[in-house]
From Swiss-Prot:
GO terms for molecular function: rRNA (pseudouridine-N3-)-methyltransferase activity. It is found in: Cytoplasm. GO terms for cellular component: cytoplasm. Belongs to the RNA methyltransferase RlmH family. HAMAP family: 23SrRNA_methyltr_H. It comes from Prochlorococcus marinus (strain MIT 9215). This is Ribosomal RNA large subunit methyltransferase H. S-adenosyl-L-methionine binds at G86, L105, S106, P107, L108, T109, F110. It is an enzyme of class 2 (transferase).
């Protein structure tokens, strides 16, 4: 079963749109252990360890449906799963090359703030799927 304390989101910049912030806060109430850090730059040295997985969000990444994403996250066993979200300029190629996975949320393009909200919802959904919660309906 997935635990929300295994996840951290590192994102460049602050959320400016109040309705996105409100949505994120709703999921934070459901998963208070989820770590969300707003940064100016990424430092992979701080995140890289034997017990950390680094997943970069990028439009050219691999796409999964919700069940597949849950299964993937379960396969990481007891490792800490760190998601990196860039700003409007995306994430540099060297960070992508040093990540464990490049993930795309959709073939559609989203503003980076909205991508943050969608990712948090998908983490919540994966946690719910893994615990057989009625939140996800196939």
């Amino acid at each position: 079963m997935l635990q929300s304390n295994r996840f951290a989101i590192y994102a460049i910049g602050k959320i400016k749109k109040h309705w996105i912030r409100d949505g994120i806060n709703q999921y934070k109430k459901r998963m208070p252990e989820l770590i969300i850090n707003e940064l100016k730059t990424f430092n992979l040295n701080n995140l890289r360890s034997n017990n950390n997985i680094i997943i970069v969000l990028s439009e050219e990444g691999k796409q999964f449906n919700s069940i597949e994403l849950c299964s993937l996250l379960l396969n990481f066993k007891n490792k800490k799963i760190n998601f990196l979200i860039g700003d409007t300029d995306g994430i540099s190629s060297d960070i992508k090359e040093n990540s464990d996975l490049i993930l795309s949320l959709s073939p559609l393009t989203f503003p980076h703030e909205l991508a943050r909200l969608i990712l948090i919802e998908q983490i919540y959904r994966a946690v719910s799927i893994s615990s057989n919660s009625p939140y996800h309906r196939s």
